[in-house]
Design a protein with these regions (language model features):
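Terminal targeting signals and extreme-terminal segments of soluble enzymes
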Residues: 1-80, 88-143
Length: 143
């Protein structure tokens, strides 16, 4: 899944805790989902503040998560999470993520979502400032 163009990339250290480990001694599937949420929140903090979105009257809604587990992560591993925007449509967004240990991709994921009007809870177009940020970085990444 590793791509050359990781637009609006966030990188975050992940701490494996004892409660992340299942009876087989490896990280439980549910922990990966929590880590994706942590990555998405860190991404929002860096690029598109959730607080500012709420103030502007809209919120991001997750529609779908797909994850593929490539290798097991264990208690003393030191994973790093990467997340980036892979695509913006008129109304939908898509992010991809990788959980890595050293240079090895342990899990890869894709999430899809929309922004909704905070009062009506109806989908809205991708906010202009996010589209602008995405396209600016996409252009600089390509050059």
């Amino acid at each position: 899944m590793t791509e050359n163009k990781k637009i609006l990339l966030i990188e975050k250290q992940i701490k494996v805790a004892t409660y992340d480990i299942d009876f087989a001694g490896i990280v439980s599937n549910i922990s990966y989902i929590r880590w994706l949420e942590d990555l998405r929140l860190a991404w929002l903090e860096k690029y598109f503040s959730l607080g500012k979105q709420i103030e502007a009257g809209f919120i991001p809604i997750l529609l779908e998560t797909q994850i593929e587990y490539h290798h097991a992560i264990r208690i003393f591993d030191q994973p790093v999470g990467l997340m980036w925007v892979s695509r913006l449509h008129s109304h939908k967004w898509r992010v991809k993520a990788e959980i890595m240990v050293q240079d090895k991709v342990m899990a890869s994921a894709e999430q899809k979502g929309v922004f909704v009007d905070g009062e009506r809870m109806k989908p809205i177009r991708i906010p202009e400032n996010l589209k602008l940020l995405y396209h600016q970085e996409k252009e600089t990444t390509l050059t």
